[in-house]
């Protein structure tokens, strides 16, 4: 199972987790990413974290509209955190279990927008090692969400997924700091969000 160190939400909200070695690894592994642009930007001229990443995202959207669905601004984007949190055994994985689909249906019962789903399976070096179980249950959960909401899964990079979440008419928050980042950018831009979390990130 491929492990990832591309944790953009963590980088913005809990930067103390990232030492210089890890920052350089992100730059080397993801040279054209939002994370790399953010790291370089902050090393040259420090800005408020949210302001810096918001400007990077908006600039990318402005110059790459061909990468997004034509109707993304008329749609609801649902973020799903998949992978280790589905069946992992660590405390942080258990805290980030996805919402029950019936609860999602209740929250979205009056939402008539077309639905897109963003998010893919994520594993890092602190994930539990029951990868096969997490993989199978992630696929099952994703498919159930897609069927329940007649939704389309956008299988893009994390950066493009983030842009879709920001551009959408409505955004449904999932688990983790990546989803929180989309929420906070949308709030900064005075865009609506469906928040599903309070203290658990």
Outline where the language-model segments fall.
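Secretory-pathway luminal glycosyltransferase catalytic domains
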Residues: 1-114, 121-127
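Donor-binding and catalytic core of enzymes assembling or modifying cell-surface/extracellular glycoconjugates
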Residues: 113-200
